[in-house]
């Protein structure tokens, strides 16, 4: 859908995993993951001015023409010279530094750890480790108000379930019926909106503010709708 860059998803999951490994306190680890992802997103925007895939690549990858255009451009320029790979090379040192710095900090007492992403993961049967890993998706990726964190978690869980059910196999590229079905139901629920800021009608400025919103029932209808419409049986193919 082009809402977010996959590099940021990967980085958010990585700092979430590191937070879980570093802290014996799940609440502290979740806050650490959210704050680290917020900083990762700021750093990423310093390099690109946007976190949206379609704005970085200049193509819409949810259709065949967009995919072909991206692949042809990559082959002509050479993958080492493509904007995405150049971005990865330039941004990775900053991302690693941010991850290392946050891993050494303590966030005890920083704020309540309750968040939409971890709550969605738990409702879908995730382990505590997985729930912490995805915490950075909260509030539209590090509280930035972008693509819905709960939806991101559900898509990740679909992929995770497929991998576990197909050990040693490579997932299909670009065509995911279960994800398409979920996206369709999600858009119907939100009136077409995918961004957290539009769905919630506000932007969160701290983990505590987000936690208060979620604990008071904010987005509960969204989480419920996602769980009702997720289809593991369809998988990715």
Task: Outline where the language-model segments fall.
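Active-site segments that bind and position negatively charged phosphate/pyrophosphate groups
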Residues: 1-23, 111-169
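Flexible coil/linker segments and helix-coil junctions enriched in charged and small residues
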Residues: 25-27
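Amphipathic alpha-helical interface segments
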Residues: 11-15, 29-124, 154-158, 172-237
